[in-house]
């Protein structure tokens, strides 16, 4: 009975179309499917109570995803600081005040500090965007399955899609998201370094720049990074799952969800969402720049401000403000809505 129902369910799911998330009221259109199963689903989705449950489930998943993203970033920020340290360069600069160091050496150290500050700042923005995207994707995939099971129970309370004691725990899945992000960090930093180098190699710290040029330069960094960086799940997935705490029994269910997460996280749509997130974060970051006079200002002074921003972004109030700017990116919710409505087990 259960297998037969799942067969019909997948037939209907593959023909799911015309998903609309407007005014927080999602509508699922099903067509060309088995009449009995189709009618059962339509009857379920047409009731006001069911729509309310759908919206509530979706909104809960997104809220939990945002919270998980902040927690994940809080852990990853220590890795960013460790892998892109600014303190040694700052200490060297302090020591030059007490020693006879040539002006050329001091300029070299200042330029190195400014370059590393840019790299750390844009790495931080990229990790913020990825945490928001991947954590929300992870919980949306799990939330969709939970809602799907709820629909099945509405259709036939005696059936269930998943065995009791499933290992699809949100804490485990967000832990996997952290492992994936941490494993990708070195590659991400390399691509940020490339983007910063290509963008700023033609300008000198002594150049006079205005706000429009600064905006163009930072936007260019985002574009170069997005064009060269591609999120992926490398290595043996069994090794990845082996890092899960032993109190959880890893089953095929969780492995399948990891494959789903990989599929959604590596699609072109996800890259577009990532780019729009970075654009929003970059725009928010620019609000911290000092007032620039009409005649312009030395780039070196702006880069000094970037150094301060790269330090402040790790503080709680600044983190919250950056994450709030991500919640304004409508493409994130649109993509999560598509994922949440993809009732397809194939």
Swiss-Prot record:
Single GO BP term: protein targeting to peroxisome
Gene Ontology MF: a single term: protein-macromolecule adaptor activity
Gene Ontology cellular-component terms listed: cytosol; nucleus; peroxisomal membrane
One matching Pfam family: Peroxin-3
Database matches in InterPro entries: Peroxin-3
Organism annotation: Schizosaccharomyces pombe (strain 972 / ATCC 24843)
Name of protein: Uncharacterized protein C29A4.14c
Alphabetical list of PANTHER family matching this protein: PEROXISOMAL BIOGENESIS FACTOR 3
